[in-house]
């Protein structure tokens, strides 16, 4: 799943590869997918985009948005975005395929679930999109200790677990159940630990881990569990994920555990991250 580090990396790669290209053709909903949702109206994507010039791509939380003059192209969650050079074969299955006048292309294929869209400026009335654009990125200067303290001190979050605090309700756009695992590992906190049990030092450590962990992931091109615009895994070696379950903790050697929790999985070292 795309989360903030991957969104930042893919946006940068898009700017390096398709910025300035003119759209020649658009195919939407070529391959049906039950868990693909579309922003805007897919039958109108062609009329909306053909002839327009690709502008800058930006990451907003876990979303990647590409400008195309006064139109926008949006991807999120499990959208597998790939660039295809002039001589490269195009995928047979996809939910969106955009070809450019120079015969290069970009395709989007939904993995588990995800969103794709195209719409004119100001047209999309989607709360997740709006919040992702309005709230400060956790890697921006505006996301400081004062702002984080505002989030973690709210009365309504005191009985929540740290997983629920960080990865639900769009409190911090871009943090999902993936990057959450290493953030909590580096902070030495269990994902089920309650917010109201945190000391002031715990809160400082958690804030620091949010910043440093996400920064490491972003600067290394995303996590090694996710693929970039060219189908390559990110350079950040994920500590806690499906690939490290039942392997020794890199700090203490305790076997990493996996549990079902809150509709997904959590990974932790029971010695380093005591509840």
What are these regions (language model features)?
Residues 24-44, 53-58, 151-275:
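Basic, nucleic-acid-binding surfaces and adjacent catalytic neighborhoods in DNA/RNA-processing proteins
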Residues 3-6, 10, 19, 144, ...:
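Alpha-helical structural motif
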Residues 116-157:
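A short, charged helix-loop
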Residues 1-5, 104-109, 122, 134-141, ...:
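Short, mixed-charge, low-aromatic patches
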Residues 49, 131-134, 139, 189, ...:
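Short clusters of hydrophobic/aromatic residues that line enzyme substrate/ligand-binding pockets
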Residues 1-130, 275:
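Acidic, proline/glycine-enriched N-terminal capping motif
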């Amino acid at each position: 799943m795309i989360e903030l580090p991957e969104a930042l990396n893919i946006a940068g790669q898009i700017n390096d590869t398709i910025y300035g290209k003119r759209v020649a053709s658009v195919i939407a909903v070529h391959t049906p997918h039950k868990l693909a949702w579309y922003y805007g109206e897919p039958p109108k994507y062609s009329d909306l985009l053909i002839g327009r010039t690709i502008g800058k791509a930006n990451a907003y939380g876990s979303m990647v948005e590409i400008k195309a003059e006064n139109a926008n192209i949006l991807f999120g969650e499990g959208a597998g975005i790939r660039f295809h050079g002039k001589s490269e074969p195009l995928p047979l299955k996809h939910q969106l395929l955009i070809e450019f006048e120079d015969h290069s292309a970009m395709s989007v294929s939904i993995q588990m679930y995800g969103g794709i869209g195209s719409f004119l400026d100001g047209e999309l009335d989607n709360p997740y999109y709006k919040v992702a654009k309005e709230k400060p990125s956790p890697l921006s200067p505006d996301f400081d200790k004062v702002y984080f303290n505002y989030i973690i001190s709210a009365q309504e979050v005191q009985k929540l677990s740290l997983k629920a605090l960080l990865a639900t309700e769009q409190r911090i756009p871009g943090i999902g159940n993936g990057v959450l695992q290493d953030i909590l590992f580096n902070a030495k906190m269990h994902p089920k630990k309650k917010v109201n049990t945190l000391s002031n030092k715990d809160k400082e450590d958690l804030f620091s881990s949010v910043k440093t962990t996400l920064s490491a992931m972003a600067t290394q091109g995303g996590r090694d569990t996710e693929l970039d615009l060219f189908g390559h895994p990110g350079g950040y070696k994920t500590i806690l994920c499906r690939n490290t379950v039942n392997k020794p903790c890199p700090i203490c050697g305790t076997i990493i555990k996996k549990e079902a929790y809150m509709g997904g999985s959590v990974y932790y070292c029971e010695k380093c991250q005591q509840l």
